[in-house]
Regions:
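Hydrophobic helical membrane-anchoring modules
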Residues: 1, 170-229
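Cell-envelope/extracellular polymer assembly enzymes that use nucleotide-activated donors
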Residues: 4-6, 36, 167
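A conserved acidic beta->alpha catalytic loop
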Residues: 41-49, 89
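Short aromatic/hydrophobic "clamp" motif used to bind/position activated sugar donors
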Residues: 82
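Short beta-strand/loop segment that forms part of the nucleotide-sugar
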Residues: 23-26, 33-43, 62
Length: 229
C-alpha cells in the first residue's frame, strides 16, 4: 500500500522553526506513512522556501492568509489522509505508531504541549487539551489529521486570515479526537505577551468569532501586532 498521508504546513517567515518541524516528520517517512510534504507559503522574504525545497517539500506560494494558504496546500496534495501542522510545531517521538493505531477512528489531533517549562505553560496546555476533550475543539497548533473525504465534505478550509481551524472543525461531521502523543508548539508569543494575557486574548477572539464577528474584522484588530506563523 502506498503511503497515505500528505503533510501540509502553512508558513510565513518560518526559516527559524521549519527545519525542526520537518525533522520530527522523518519517523513518519520511515514508517511508510508520509507520501509528501506540501509547504504553503504566504510570501516569506527569509529562507523558508529554500529550506522547504532542500528538504524535498513541494512549495506553493500565495497571499498570506492562513485559511487560504491551507486551502491551496491541501488542494495541491494527493494523500488519502491529510495532516495539517503549523511551522513551529514539533511532533513527539513515537507519534507515527499512535497515528497508525488511530487512523481508522476518524479525525484526530495531538495533545498540546509548549516548548517551555513552568506551571503557566502546563496550565495553558492542560486547558487546551480539556477543551479538546469536552468540546471537540482543538486549535491548529495541535495538528489535525483527517481523511480527505471528510475534509472535502466539510467544505475545506475557508479562505480567511484567522479562526480557519475552528471553522473547519465545526464543519466536520466526525468529531475530532485527541491522541496522547504531543505536538510541541512555540511559546514565544505567550512569553512576550504574558501567559494570562495571551490566553484571555484567545478566549475573547473565539467568543467574538462564535458571536458572528467576521474574521476580517477580527484580523484588523488582532493581526497587525500578531502575525501568523
Amino acid at each position: 500500500m502506498s503511503a497515505p498521508i500528505s503533510i501540509v504546513i502553512p508558513t510565513l517567515e518560518s526559516a527559524r522553526t521549519l527545519p525542526v518541524t520537518l525533522l520530527s516528520l522523518i519517523e513518519g517517512v520511515d514508517e511508510g506513512l508520509i507520501c509528501e510534504v506540501v509547504v504553503s507559503d504566504g510570501g516569506s522574504k527569509d529562507a523558508t522556501q529554500s529550506i522547504a525545497e532542500a528538504w524535498g517539500a513541494e512549495v506553493v506560494e500565495g497571499p498570506s492568509s492562513r485559511g487560504g494558504q491551507l486551502r491551496r496546500g491541501v488542494a495541491l496534495s494527493r494523500g488519502v489522509w491529510v495532516l495539517i501542522l503549523h511551522s513551529d510545531t514539533v511532533l513527539q517521538a513515537g507519534w507515527a505508531l499512535e497515528v497508525q493505531q488511530w487512523m481508522d477512528r476518524g479525525p484526530q489531533c495531538f495533545s498540546l504541549a509548549f516548548n517551555a517549562s513552568g506551571i503557566a505553560a502546563r496550565l495553558v496546555a492542560a486547558w487546551a487539551n480539556l477543551r479538546t476533550d469536552l468540546l471537540c475543539l482543538p486549535y491548529g497548533d495541535q495538528g489535525l489529521l483527517l481523511r480527505r473525504i471528510d475534509y472535502d465534505e466539510a467544505g475545506g478550509y475557508p479562505d480567511q486570515p484567522l479562526m480557519e481551524d475552528v471553522a473547519l472543525v465545526w464543519a466536520l461531521s466526525p468529531r475530532v479526537r485527541r491522541m496522547q502523543s504531543h505536538a510541541f508548539t512555540g511559546a514565544e508569543k505567550y512569553q512576550q505577551q504574558g501567559w494570562m494575557r495571551r490566553g484571555v486574548r484567545n478566549l475573547i477572539l473565539l467568543a467574538r468569532y462564535s458571536a458572528g464577528v467576521k474574521p476580517e474584522d477580527l484580523a484588523r484588530a488582532y493581526l497587525p501586532s500578531d502575525p501568523p506563523n
